Amino acid sequence: MNKRNYMNTSVQEPPLDYSFRSIHVTQDLLSEEPRTGLRPVRHAKSGKSMTQSLWLNNNVLTDLRDFNHAVSQLLEHPENLAWIDLSFNDLTSIDPVLTTFFNLSVLYLHGNSIQRLGEVNKLAALPRLRSLTLHGNPIEEEKGYRQYVLCTLPHITTFDFSGVTKADRTTAEVWKRMNIKPKKVRIKHNAL
């Protein structure tokens, strides 16, 4: 990416806000008007939004099919997307498409229907992820939920709207040593 096309993600623009729009599929974003806030979202000459935040909370999304396509149609610089709010939808898994946004630092997934704790592993591919929410999903009931997430994502500083402390990290490491067994390597012997 050249410097001319790079947007400073430290400058916080208002979000592109599609919350409370009864959106069922991501393609609906292209025909739906975003909510207006106190400050208007800036647009490029192309008509696309210049924001780094996309809010899709409180809708009825069950998957993120065509998410990349919709985002590329809405944002001038989709590669700079830093905040995605998908809270209070009906997502049952963490779609790998989210891992394509390498600048993602805030991801809200609370209040969905994510059932497998192993889904969190996908988010380890996001090097800048610092804030994550998953509470209100069935995985929250899993034994060791917080420790598992903190072990899997050691760079996050806020989890479920609570700061991650040194004590949390220590507890997570102890939990990991007690609960996550290293995979045994099987050696195959060729029969002669």
Curated annotation (Swiss-Prot):
Domain of life (superkingdom): Eukaryota
The answer to whether keyword Cytoplasm applies is yes
Please tell me whether the keyword Repeat is annotated for this protein: yes
Domain LRRCT stretches: 137-175
Where is it found, in Gene Ontology cellular component terms?
axoneme
Q: What subcellular compartments does it reside in?
A: Cytoplasm
Name the InterPro entries on file: Leu-rich_rpt, LRR_dom_sf
At which residues are the LRR repeats? 50-71, 80-101, 103-124
UniProtKB keywords: Cytoplasm, Leucine-rich repeat, Repeat
Recorded hits in PANTHER family, A to Z, give: LEUCINE-RICH REPEAT-CONTAINING PROTEIN 51
Q: What is this protein called?
A: Leucine-rich repeat-containing protein 51
Q: From which organism does this entry originate?
A: Bos taurus
Q: Which gene encodes it?
A: LRRC51
